[in-house]
Amino acid sequence: QYIKIVVEESEDVEGRTKMTDKVIENNQVTVMGEVVSNFSYSHEIYGEGFYMVDIKCTRLSDSFDIIPVMVSERLLDVTASYVGMLLCVNGQFRSYNRHEERKNRLVLSVFAREVKFIEEMEESSKTNQIYLDGYICKEPVYRKTPLGREIADLLLAVNRPYGKSDYIPCICWGRNARYAEHFKVGERCAIWGRIQSREYMKKLDEEHVEKRVAFEVSVSKLELLEEAQVQESIV
């Protein structure tokens, strides 16, 4: 069980605009990579259609992550195929709960605010980077892998405008894992890292398993933010 933490928005227009800007700044993603799927319909809000497309982001290790991106039909012609083309996406990492098998499943994707096609990928490019400023909403889970690697799992609540929040799973390694182990629910935390995809096997019953893909933030840097900074962001 986790708690929802929401920062109150200002009632006046100027204050509302400032708060919206701050909330947008607290969830920033850039992914660059090859388009590896066509668009599939997701949903519609106030007449604006949203579609999903997959981007293949390479890692330094020559492996890769397939990142789902949600794009408005107003940003791109979603009836066209861009498979094989290189795309740069700026946006936010968002979550929603999908009800299935009598449970809620957390579904994550990059919500595109800006998209542009690029000619080539430079080796020095930051092809997959994310910054989050949110609140610890579940007790951190620290453990060691069978090979002795230290890991800590965090769930970060990141505020959106109008009282909504995104719940982002984050994984810390080594020294960061030992540091994050002691974080408390409700503390404000800043995280830098990358979005990674991870395959796992879901046991459906005694005889059947299903391959699924989880998405999470692999943390390269994190810090707790002081109360003074928290108050400053609310004012």
Where are these regions (language model features)?
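Single-stranded nucleic acid-binding surfaces, predominantly the OB-fold ssDNA-binding core
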Residues: 2-7, 12-235
